[in-house]
Amino acid sequence: MVLLSILRILLLWGLVLFMEHRVQMTQVGQPSIAHLPEAPTLPLIQELLEEAPGKQQRKPRILGHPLRYMLELYQRSADASGHPRENRTIGATMVRLVRPLASVARPLRGSWHIQTLDFPLRPNRVAYQLVRATVVYRHQLHLTHSHLSCHVEPWVQKSPTNHFPSSGRGSSKPSLLPKAWTEMDIMEHVGQKLWNHKGRRVLRLRFVCQQPRGSEVREFWWHGTSSLDTVFLLLYFNDTQSVQKTKPLPKGLKEFTEKDPSLLLRRARQAGSIASEVPGPSREHDGPESNLCSLHPFQVSFQQLGWDHWIIAPHLYTPNYCKGVCPRVLHYGLNSPNHAIIQNLVNELVDQSVPQPSCVPYKYVPISILLIEANGSILYKEYEGMIAQSCTCR
């Protein structure tokens, strides 16, 4: 049974990876893996698979400040096992770091140096609401023999300068940035002009730098500065899907299930002799207490699963599993649904061909994952229902 549970977990994760690959490769115009079988569109599996690149795609070489920023964000928001911290302050369940496409630099014009940056925006997903958008950039560039003072502004054709509104500057969130960097809120600009548009969307910004008076910045020094490491976009999302919770048992049924088991079974057998002309043999006991339904720890590394080419953190995943025999009387502490309680009575009294309730996870906790998407973006995301925390019979 343990091996079967493990194989089920690995199969589900395999389906997750496959479906995510198909969605991502379709969006970037690459073919999917032809030799993999078709997979069912289970909601959680489909959601996770929408983030991962194909296995044949090597992890993009993402170094420098974007990766350092997201690693620090992850460490502040989750522990080493991936459990979200209770005191996390990012105010979102998903953060996507988007790097610009290849930039276009204008010819030098006196002391001004301008680069046009395009940030591709993925299609909207109904399940996620954009709650914050910021641009992070270096406001001081230290080049050989000189330095530049820089800022980011919205791109407007034939406009020398067009600053964001002063109210959008700065950030009220705790900063993860060194002193040479600035994070600026551009939610109003993104939300009004781009986010609700259909089709391909690109956020175009200008990275404008000015050299001090009396200094000279040679053109080859400027072109040696990579905008991929000096400017990036951060998009913050919240999951809008409601999590369905198990309803508590009615008061009468709760009292019914908490009565003395022997008395309850005697009454049940009496009812069974009326309900069934040929009742089957009853179970005399539930077995040793160690065999009862309970939570068992289980851990696997993403490297073992072959997913370390796109998952940055954590390195280990502890899904856990439930195993054991469900007792004859499902007491209230097991949090079993009404259907399972009735099913157990039917198995005991009426027809043993009706299976007993199974030992399955009841409560889950999320896991935070930092990963690289197919297009090279870095994603922090909290996935619900990934770690079993308690068990029930149903």
Swiss-Prot record:
Residues bearing carbohydrate: N87, N238, N375
Cellular compartments annotated: Secreted
Keywords attached to this entry: Cytokine, Disulfide bond, Glycoprotein, Growth factor, Secreted, Signal
Domain of life where this protein originates: Eukaryota
Subunit structure: Homodimer or heterodimer (Potential). But, in contrast to other members of this family, cannot be disulfide-linked.
Similarity comment: Belongs to the TGF-beta family.
Name of the featured protein: Bone morphogenetic protein 15
Native source organism of the sequence: Bos taurus
